[in-house]
């Protein structure tokens, strides 16, 4: 219940005494649906356009393009879950049934871990191509079958990381109100494992990989004078920086909740502060889904031209004067 537990505050606050639960719930009912709706609309349009560009104009057997496509696909899966969480926050009751509780949790987690793993893969692919150009590992995967198999493996990893929480998600009836939550077996270590997994796979592993790879890539690019290569690495670095700026606060709060689970910070004030903080940092983290398309549009000239080319095909009267040649 790390990312949904503020929906069932009534079940949690009694452990440590009363605190101002109503103020947190009122804030959730007003703030979360509006923010989730904005993120969903902006993110779905942007990532949908990215997917269209990559399918229509790019070679999906190319590993870089395949990573970008699956990154957009991960964001789309993540975004599809937001209308359900928005409704859940607004009415404080889950009305979609047990199957959808599992399904929406799966979309959320697959999108989250998919984004991480494909960003890691994209980083390793660029590192191999630049630092080890003579023995480029991914050159052997530049076929539709091989690259698709590697992408499928990333999705299997995402499913493996998500599966425990998908299995343990369930609909419970509390005081005649249905709630979708993750309930771990009594006496098990699954909840602790979930917190640790989220911090390790969500921040520590990707940060370590990216620091290692880009600390070796950047010096090589500093010696080059090819503008296109500079722009390509700039786009990837910006993607990574944005990802960590938006997800680090969330991981910090998750770590604090893990400490609370171990018996630290047990006061009612800490309980309320963490619930309120989770809403803010989780919404910030959700917003990263909107940013990848914006980065492509403003950093990559090629993507900007291809965006406009697609828009010209769909809306010729509006965009005929906007398309420029590369």
Go through the PLM ranges and name each one:
Residues 1-45, 186, 194-195:
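Extracellular N-terminal segment of 7TM GPCRs
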Residues 14-23, 89-113, 131-132, 138-151, ...:
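Loop architecture of class A 7-transmembrane GPCRs
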Residues 25-37, 57-122, 128-141, 189, ...:
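Extracellular TM2-ECL1-early TM3 structural module of rhodopsin-like
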Residues 28-57, 74, 208-214:
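First transmembrane helix
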Residues 40, 70-82, 151-162, 199-207, ...:
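Alpha-helical transmembrane segments of multi-pass membrane proteins
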Residues 67, 119, 147-152, 196-197, ...:
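Hydrophobic alpha-helical transmembrane segments
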Residues 242-248, 252-254, 276-326:
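Seventh transmembrane helix
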């Amino acid at each position: 219940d790390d990312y949904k537990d503020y929906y069932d505050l009534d079940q949690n606050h009694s452990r440590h005494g009363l605190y101002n639960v109503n103020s947190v719930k009122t804030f959730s009912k007003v703030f979360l649906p509006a923010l989730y709706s904005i993120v969903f609309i902006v993110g779905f349009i942007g990532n949908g356009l990215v997917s269209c560009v990559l399918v229509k104009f790019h070679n999906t057997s190319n590993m870089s393009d395949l990573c970008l496509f699956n990154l957009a696909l991960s964001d789309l899966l993540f975004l599809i879950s937001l209308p359900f969480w928005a409704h859940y926050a607004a009415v404080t009751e889950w009305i979609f049934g047990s199957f959808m509780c599992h399904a929406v949790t799966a979309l959320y987690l697959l999108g989250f871990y998919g984004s991480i793993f494909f960003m890691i893969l994209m980083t390793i692919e660029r590192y191999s191509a630049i630092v080890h150009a003579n023995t480029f590992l991914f050159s052997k995967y530049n076929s539709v079958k091989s690259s698709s198999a590697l992408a499928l493996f990333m999705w299997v990893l995402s499913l493996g990381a998500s599966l425990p929480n998908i299995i343990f998600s369930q609909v419970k009836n509390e005081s005649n109100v249905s709630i979708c939550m993750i309930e771990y077996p009594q006496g098990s270590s699954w909840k602790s494992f979930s917190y640790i997994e989220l911090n390790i796979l969500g921040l520590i592993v990707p940060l370590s990989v990216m620091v290692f790879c880009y600390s070796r890539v950047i010096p090589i690019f500093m010696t080059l004078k090819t503008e296109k290569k500079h722009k390509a690495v700039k786009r990837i670095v910006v993607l990574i920086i944005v990802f960590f700026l938006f997800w680090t606060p969330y991981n910090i709060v998750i770590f604090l909740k893990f400490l609370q689970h171990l018996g630290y910070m047990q006061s009612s004030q800490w309980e309320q502060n963490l619930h309120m903080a989770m809403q803010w940092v989780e919404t910030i983290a959700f917003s990263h889904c909107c940013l990848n398309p914006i980065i492509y549009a403003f950093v990559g000239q090629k993507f900007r031209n291809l965006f406009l080319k697609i828009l010209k095909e769909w809306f010729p009267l509006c965009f005929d004067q906007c398309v420029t040649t590369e």
